[in-house]
Amino acid sequence: ADMAKVSQEAAEKAGLTMADIEWIGVGTPGVANSATGVIEYSNNLGFNNTPMVKYLETALGKPTFIENDANAAAYGEYVAGAAKGAKNAVCITLGTGVGAGIVIDGKIYSGSNFGGAEVGHTVISVDGPQCTCGRKGCFEVYSSATGLVRMTKEALAANPESAMKDEERISARTAFNYMRAGDATAKQVVDDYIKYLAAGITNTINI
């Protein structure tokens, strides 16, 4: 998608014109170099050394800043959300991938290469499914919404008697919905998902 066009459409949906906007903030998955304005690598979005700040400032004429999306979420929680008042905090985000943001003494921890909290690519199982990063068995492979959909489809293929067979489109909610209705296959999917999620959270705490 054209990020400048998407930004303009978002402003219009909010009832704003670009004249109403002082600056633009971009939260992106992957390694975002906030010093240079370059998205160095984002495996899920296909960005590779993309000069996002330069592009948006040229296209929209507004000061623009980038940050890893999980870092931005973590700082938001630290300032005004669940972590308000804490000295240090970790926020794990679950979506297309798995991300994390770490705040230490009020500052985002970026690491030496702006990838200091890429916990989604810590390995849960060395012989696990392939991750988009190139490794196998990453936390993200099991605990993202994408991973949950994959596990649900695999369980359904192995257990075609499951009531989930009637679902037209498998989503991240499917296994949870059918588990509540008493489906044994769905319950196993959810149990496995929680097991992997717990392992990933525990690893993050131990870092």
What are these regions (language model features)?
Residues A1-W23, N33-T36, V53-T64, G76-K87, ...:
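ATP-binding/phosphotransfer module of carbohydrate and carboxylate kinases, centering on a glycine-rich
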Residues G30-S34, A72-A74, G99:
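Short, active-site-adjacent cap segments at secondary-structure transitions
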